[in-house]
């Protein structure tokens, strides 16, 4: 169960040498954590499995069934036990159809799928142990001009969080489809009662970006482009070589990160552009009950359960570029210039810091993409500049033991 002053109990721990940005080298105990039981986010390629300890995988919009991968034995198998099954219909326990997002939660699979030539959507479930595919909710167009392609954020405290997306098209004179209408709404779906509740509707075709949800608290980000801002492509063409692309956002985007109580509707700003908010494009903005963000040189975590903020890490100098992410009960803080990069992993619970070896490069050596209980899937930047996907144990990642990677 979640703890108010830190992540759930660590799964394992070890001692490594640390060299933080502001402390002398010392011995730090590194702890790794199991994946969260709540605020479980849906995935589109790799989905962590608390049941197996590994991953569920599929090829997005190509493969209609899932596979299981065990990083301990480095083996892949299809979770279907029918002899001669082709995994091509709902009678197969590995088959879902065209999956746009999937998660394992409390012993069940939940997925958003598309059907009818991608014009309709359904939210479906089945037990991880196998069984028939059950449709929990579906959205079908009323005519040939409508399309429903709905989204699936994830699950938390017995509810699924979905985006209902309706698009309307018309045919142009040359026979091409032209988008003429958009309607979006964020909804919660009670897994026990089957009740769907609309949380908010779009404004001018946009919805706030959901960072995370914990019990009745949800954190959103809104973004507005300032009036008179140039198009991003035009701006890039005018910049000198080496200009960080996120400078455009810092100059022309107004960000606001805020929490909203789903019962009362009350909102509270966490951070906005009145402070020196440093935005990140990394998708790992939320883990368990925590949200990560940066203001100036300091990285903070917001606790959705206690609705409190903790300053977690401060860089000892200004840097040209920053990035940050949160996973495995740690915040990964990254900084650098066009030629150099430094990175640290900070444990949310005890604030211990270990510096990650970037091998003298201008990027973090392994960029985490997905995690299961004991392993990370990440992008490895090699000497030639080619980026490839590898597995690494969490312990090896924190020890910067990149000899431990495997594919």
Model-based region annotation:
Residues 1-13:
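Sec-dependent signal peptide cleavage junction
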Residues 40-50, 89-104, 142-157, 204-215, ...:
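Repeated scaffold domains used in trafficking and secretory/extracellular systems
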């Amino acid at each position: 169960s979640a703890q108010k002053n830190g992540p759930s109990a660590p799964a394992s721990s070890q001692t490594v040498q640390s060299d933080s940005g502001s402390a002398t080298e010392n011995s730090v105990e590194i702890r790794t954590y199991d994946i969260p039981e709540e605020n479980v986010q849906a995935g589109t390629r790799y989905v962590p499995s608390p049941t197996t300890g590994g991953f569920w995988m599929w090829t997005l919009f190509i493969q209609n069934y899932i596979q299981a991968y065990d990083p301990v034995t480095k083996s892949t198998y299809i979770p279907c036990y029918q002899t001669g099954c082709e995994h091509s219909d709902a009678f197969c326990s590995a088959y879902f159809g065209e999956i746009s997002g999937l998660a394992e939660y409390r012993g069940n699979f939940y997925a958003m799928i598309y059907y009818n030539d991608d014009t309709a959507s359904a939210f479906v479930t089945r037990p991880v142990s196998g069984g028939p595919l059950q449709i929990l909710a579906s959205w079908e167009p009323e005519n040939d001009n409508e399309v429903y392609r709905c989204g699936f954020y994830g699950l938390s405290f017995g509810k699924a969080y979905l985006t209902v997306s309706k698009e309307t098209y018309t045919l142009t004179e040359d026979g091409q489809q032209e988008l003429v209408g958009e309607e979006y709404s964020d909804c919660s779906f009670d897994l026990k009662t089957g009740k769907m509740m609309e949380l908010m509707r779009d404004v001018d075709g946009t919805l706030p970006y959901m960072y995370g949800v914990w019990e009745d608290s949800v954190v959103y980000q809104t973004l507005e482009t300032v009036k008179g801002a140039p198009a991003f492509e035009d701006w890039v063409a005018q910049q000198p070589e080496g200009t960080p692309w996120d400078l455009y956002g810092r100059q022309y985007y107004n960000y606001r990160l805020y929490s909203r109580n789903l019962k009362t509707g009350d909102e509270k700003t966490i951070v906005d552009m009145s402070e020196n908010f440093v935005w990140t494009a990394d998708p790992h903005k939320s883990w368990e009950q925590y949200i990560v963000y940066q203001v100036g040189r300091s990285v903070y975590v917001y606790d959705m359960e206690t609705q409190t903020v903790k300053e977690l890490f401060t860089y000892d100098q200004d840097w040209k570029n920053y990035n940050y992410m949160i996973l495995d009960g740690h915040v990964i803080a990254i900084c650098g210039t066009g030629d150099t990069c430094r990175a640290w992993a900070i444990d949310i619970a005890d604030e211990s810091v270990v510096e990650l070896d970037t091998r003298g490069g201008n990027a973090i050596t392994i960029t985490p993409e997905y995690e299961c209980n004991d392993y990370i899937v990440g992008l490895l930047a090699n000497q030639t500049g080619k980026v490839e996907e590898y597995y690494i144990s969490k312990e090896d990642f924190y020890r910067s033991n990149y000899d431990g990677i495997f594919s």
